[in-house]
């Protein structure tokens, strides 16, 4: 009888352990591991995902990694993107839905030489732009900043052409290109275009609509743990940095420290609505602004991409990880 009870107990424990097994969840970033992804690596390092019942795999993006396509093909559950790219994906039949964000504003900035004191001084300059600029912020900039007649050249992801020509303005990211300028012992003004009214969020968490419908609990757990990871990372990034450097062997302590300092300086994670709504918060008015921008610039067809249904607040609205 005792042996029989022992067998029942063992079976019960086995079933209990099986039911508690962590659920696999794959998250793909938009670049090599860096400080801008620190909160996710912090959540991984501190077992926040594990404690939430998830077995999270973080995959790095990169210059030739088409994360939206990979997510659509089932290679990732959620990705880092932005709400503009998510809307544009609907135009191509990919139902990608923002569920939260990392940055309360875009990380895109214009780097200028010291003679540019304000947006009015951009007139007559030549701009170095990456290819994706033409389907994202450049149509907005041409209209909002009166740059319709501006000369443009390809941005080759090197700061040398910019440093060599005082008439150039270069696109960049608040956390990246200014570091390269600093390392070259040069000077540049940094103008985040969000300060001039560019509405999209930066580094949003975007998931397939089908994933949200089939696995809402997993998405909710991932979002909540990630936001706590971001709060912890900005307080003490040590644990996350270990994983970042393990994944990206080219990443230095100096560059990580610069990225964190820039995120704090510009309140990229903690500013705006995050002050009261919590880290990662997204709101309908902000999302609507981006949708309207794309419609106005004929980058999406509102008949094919209606605003309703293109986003969800259900996972982030009640998380409220206050900075």
Residue ranges of predicted features:
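Sec/Tat signal peptide C-region and signal peptidase I cleavage site
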Residues: 16-21
């Amino acid at each position: 009888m005792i042996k029989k009870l022992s067998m029942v107990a063992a079976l019960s424990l086995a079933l209990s352990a099986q039911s508690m097994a962590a659920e696999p969840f794959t998250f793909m970033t938009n670049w090599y591991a860096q400080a801008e992804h620190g909160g996710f690596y912090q959540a991984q390092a501190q077992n926040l995902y594990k404690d939430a019942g998830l077995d999270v795999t973080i995959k790095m993006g990169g210059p030739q990694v088409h994360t939206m396509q990979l997510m659509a093909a089932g290679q990732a559950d959620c990705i880092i993107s932005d709400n503009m790219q998510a809307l544009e994906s609907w135009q191509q039949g990919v139902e990608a839905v923002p569920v939260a964000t990392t940055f309360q504003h875009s990380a895109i900035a214009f780097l200028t030489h010291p003679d540019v004191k304000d947006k009015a001084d951009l007139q007559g300059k030549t701009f170095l732009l990456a290819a994706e600029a033409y389907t994202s912020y450049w149509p907005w900039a041409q209209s909002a900043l009166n740059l319709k007649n501006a000369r443009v050249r390809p941005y080759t992801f090197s700061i040398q052409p910019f440093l060599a020509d005082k008439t150039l303005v270069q696109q960049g990211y608040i956390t990246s290109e200014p570091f390269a300028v600093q390392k070259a012992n040069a000077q540049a003004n940094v103008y985040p275009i969000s300060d001039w009214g560019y509405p999209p969020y930066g580094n949003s968490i975007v998931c397939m609509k089908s994933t949200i419908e089939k696995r809402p609990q997993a998405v909710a757990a991932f979002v909540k743990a990630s936001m706590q990871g971001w709060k912890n990372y900005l307080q003490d990034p040590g644990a996350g940095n270990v994983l970042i450097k393990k994944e990206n062997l080219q990443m230095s302590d100096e560059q990580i420290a610069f990225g964190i300092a820039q995120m704090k300086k510009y309140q990229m994670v903690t500013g705006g609505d995050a002050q009261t709504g919590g880290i990662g918060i997204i709101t309908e008015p902000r999302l609507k602004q981006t949708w309207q921008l794309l419609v106005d610039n004929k980058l999406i067809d509102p008949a094919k991409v209606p605003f309703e249904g293109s986003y969800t607040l259900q996972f982030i609205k009640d998380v409220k990880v206050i900075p």
